[in-house]
């Protein structure tokens, strides 16, 4: 149940953000709470990387379909 783990992690971060608990993740959350513009900057930085991965996957799928169209396995001597 991955959603249970994610929800538990969210709860831990919420607890860390409201208390004096220090960890790498808690510091990041506390910085985002202090300056919400950092959230937009972080999202903008990761968006182009995600788009290039999607484009690469589309290209790979196109190449796979082209190969499968050329040889459909009906030849007896190859």
Curated annotation (Swiss-Prot):
InterPro entries: Ribosomal_protein_uL10. GO terms for molecular function: large ribosomal subunit rRNA binding; structural constituent of ribosome. It is found in: Nucleus; Cytoplasm. Residues 51-64 have a biased composition (Basic and acidic residues). GO terms for cellular component: cytoplasm; cytosolic large ribosomal subunit; nucleus. P0 forms a pentameric complex by interaction with dimers of P1 and P2. PANTHER family: 60S ACIDIC RIBOSOMAL PROTEIN P0 (PTHR45699), LARGE RIBOSOMAL SUBUNIT PROTEIN UL10 (PTHR45699:SF3). Ribosomal protein P0 is the functional equivalent of E.coli protein L10. This is Large ribosomal subunit protein uL10. It comes from Culicoides nubeculosus. The lineage of its organism: Eukaryota, Metazoa, Ecdysozoa, Arthropoda, Hexapoda.
């Amino acid at each position: 149940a991955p959603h249970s783990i994610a929800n538990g992690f969210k709860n831990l971060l919420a607890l860390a953000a409201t208390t004096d608990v220090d960890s790498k993740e808690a510091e990041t959350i506390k910085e985002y709470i202090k300056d919400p513009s950092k959230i937009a900057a972080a999202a903008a930085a990761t968006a182009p990387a995600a788009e290039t991965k999607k484009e690469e996957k589309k290209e790979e799928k196109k190449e796979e379909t082209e190969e499968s169209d050329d040889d459909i396995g009906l030849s007896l001597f190859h």
